[in-house]
């Protein structure tokens, strides 16, 4: 195997060239000395120079001889090395082949499954219409057969089903009756209490209705009396305002005394003042102040007397 081309080879060649150049220069110098000196002196110097050159070139010569030996060894072992490389390549290829065979053996089922899956997909795609048609046909036949079987089962078990339904209905009614009885037993006291309360309310309502029927005339009379009192109070206020107005105008020519009738005094004053301008003003005042017109009750003098007694004396009411 050759060792040329290494990084140290260039440096070694440069060193050898430098040594060769030095030897050439020395030989040239030695030649000049030979021309000038004696033969003995020249031989001595030449021998010394050659020894120096030999000593200097000995490593180079040794390296060169070693290189030649190595080249001879390389040439001798070249076939063995080539064979070794070939054997290594063969061994590597054999190992690689074994690894590939192992990988193939490992992945063969996957590859087979994948190829088989692709084939099955192709077959499915090709036979899918026929498969669908056959599936639909089988489904129709199966549904028809199932319908027949179900009808036969229904016809066979119809009586049992009806009997079971009736039994369940009876059981449900019995359970419901028990629950209702339990509820009735639980709520019986409350229902009785509610009935008693309802009866008490009914009797109380009847009593209240009787009381209302008994007190209705009195209540109506009390309402009428209250209304009459309100109307009398309004009439009294109106008469008082009229008397005050007449008194302010100086048209009151009658001195009111405790025994003087308030209505008569006011009526006379109004009649005297407004005579000829208004139609019967005294009549209007009398109509307003008359208790028989306002209340629709008899004995107006008694009502007016009671009002006058409540207001105080006529002179106090008129402010004179």
Curated annotation (Swiss-Prot):
Cellular component per GO?
A: symbiont-containing vacuole
Q: Which UniProt keywords apply?
A: Coiled coil, Secreted, Signal
Going by the entry's taxonomy, the superkingdom of the source organism is recorded as Bacteria
Please give the Gene Ontology molecular function terms for this protein: actin filament binding
The main location class comes to: secreted
Q: Where in the cell is it found?
A: Secreted
Residues forming coiled coils: 191-251
What is any one GO biological process for this UniProt entry?
A: biological process involved in interaction with host
According to the record, the signal peptide region is 1-28
Please give the function described in this protein's UniProt entry: Associates with actin filament appendages that are formed in the inclusion appendages of the parasitophorous vacuole during infection of the host erythrocyte.
Name the chain's protein.
Appendage-associated protein
Source organism per entry reads Anaplasma marginale (strain Virginia)
């Amino acid at each position: 195997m050759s060792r040329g081309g290494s990084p140290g080879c260039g440096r070694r060649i440069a060193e050898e060239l430098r040594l060769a150049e030095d030897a050439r220069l020395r030989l040239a110098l030695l030649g000049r000395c030979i021309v000038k000196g004696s033969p003995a002196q020249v031989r001595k110097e030449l021998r010394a120079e050659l020894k120096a050159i030999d000593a200097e070139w000995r490593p180079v010569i040794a390296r060169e001889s070693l290189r030649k030996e190595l080249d001879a060894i390389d040439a001798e072992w070249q076939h063995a090395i080539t064979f070794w490389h070939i054997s290594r390549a063969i061994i590597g290829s054999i190992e690689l082949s074994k690894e590939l065979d192992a990988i193939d053996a490992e992945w063969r089922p996957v590859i087979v499954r994948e190829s088989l899956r692709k084939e099955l997909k192709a077959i499915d795609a090709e036979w899918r219409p026929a498969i669908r048609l056959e599936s639909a046909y089988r489904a129709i036949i199966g549904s028809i057969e199932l319908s027949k079987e179900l009808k036969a089962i229904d016809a066979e078990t119809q009586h049992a089903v009806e009997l079971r339904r009736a039994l369940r209905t009876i059981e449900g009614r019995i359970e419901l009756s028990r629950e209702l009885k339990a509820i009735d037993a639980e709520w019986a006291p409350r229902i009785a209490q509610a009935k008693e309360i309802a009866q008490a309310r009914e009797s109380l309502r009847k009593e209240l209705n009787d009381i209302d029927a008994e007190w209705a005339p009195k209540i109506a009379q009390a309402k009428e009396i209250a209304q009459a009192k309100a109307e009398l109070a309004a009439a009294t206020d109106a008469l008082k305002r009229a008397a005050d107005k007449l008194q302010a105008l100086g048209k009151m020519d009658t001195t009111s005394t405790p025994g003087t009738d308030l209505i008569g005094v006011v009526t006379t004053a109004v009649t005297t003042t407004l005579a000829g301008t208004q139609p019967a003003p005294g009549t209007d005042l009398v109509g307003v102040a008359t208790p028989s017109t306002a209340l629709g009750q008899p004995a107006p003098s008694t009502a007016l007397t009671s009002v006058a007694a409540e207001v105080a004396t006529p002179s106090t009411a008129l402010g004179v």
